[in-house]
Amino acid sequence: MTELLPDSVTSSVFLRRDALAAGVSHAAIAAAVRDGDWVRLRHGAYVAGDLFRRASAEERHALLARAVVRQSQTEVVLSHLSAVPEYGGPLWGVPADVVHVTRLDRRAGRKEAGVRQHQGLLQDGDVVLRNGVAVTSPTRTLIDVTTCAQLEAALVIVNDLLHRRLTTLADARQRYETMQHHPYTLKTDLVLRLADPRIESVGETRTFIVCWRQGLPAPVPQWAVNDDLGHEFARLDLAWPEYKVWLEFDGREKYTKFRREGESVIDAVLREKKRESKIAELTGWRCIRITWDDLADPVRLAARIAAVLRLAA
């Protein structure tokens, strides 16, 4: 069905009025949705079914957000959590069905299901064009996220933005100083204190938070290990050098997304085991390996880490 529409329409989100203007009937639209050729993102907004099915959770949110922007009756920019996918960031632990926008006219917006309109004052440099859509800058997005997401979810996003050098802690703190009148910024202080650009992944951030909440010694992210010649051999996800213990987070990406060319999952697992053995040989340290399932029970995970640290002390 999408072949009836121009490429400029079907390449992303299109509205019912776009389809009607292209000569597609109401009945044909209904049939396209029923057959899965189109997916309805929200009332009157669609995307090609194959594009939607290939999309990640973050990409699907970005499609939904574009639908909201296209249907908005006033000028808005994607902001807060809805700005994150435009920078390729993760949306962990947050509602993916709510789109956040900031109005440029600073007026109070009408309540609408699935849309949260913000009235925040946007200063020079706070809005950029990203992927063809107006969105808050990485620095402004970082600050805004801390005001609308829970601590752990916010820190996941903040660390990601910092690690990929889309902004810096210095820039974030400077921008935050100009927003002290902004509501809900008390949590921002804490997030900025906990943030660490060395932390690379969602799993590492969540593990760091477990340690902090359970009163464990703070681990050092990305600890470098050198070989016998003094060359860097590996970087450890999280480490406690004083205890000679390190932690590796075994997320699925380690064995799928980051596989080497021609390497099977089994090959990747074996390579990781050899790497662990070599690190232990070079350092004499003990390794703790955890997975997503471990993070589902933070108290139990903290007890496990604490037990290893006690033995090593």
Predicted segments, located by residue:
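Surface segments flanking catalytic/ligand-binding clefts of nucleic-acid enzymes
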Residues: D7-T10, S25, L162-A313
